[in-house]
Amino acid sequence: MSTNASGSPVLSLLIPIYNVQRYLRECLDSALAQTLKDIEIICINDGSTDNSPAIIREYMERDGRVKMIDKANSGYGDSMNHGLEMARGKYVGILESDDFMASDALENLSRPPIAIMPTLRRRT
């Protein structure tokens, strides 16, 4: 993973997870396919009883940017707090585990379009 001058990724992407094995691969594939590569992906497993933790471990073996917090079920807010504690990025984003992103989504968000339009006024 490339990092900025401080040694931290530009963006920490938090993914709260609870029993979403059906959607998780598509979600993680979209996170890893981002054109903005300077990210860390923090999966917060909130006590899933399905195959979600095994899927996360599989992705962790494939890509060092994927990390997991594995904790007892305590709800969404607690999951986000754990993720924020671990996040090292300058910015933090959230991707829900049953969603996916276009491959350029984070890059587009990191470089918002700026338009400058000069105004000329003629004095009479």
What does each model-found stretch correspond to?
Residues 1-124:
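Nucleotide-sugar donor-binding/catalytic module of glycosyltransferases
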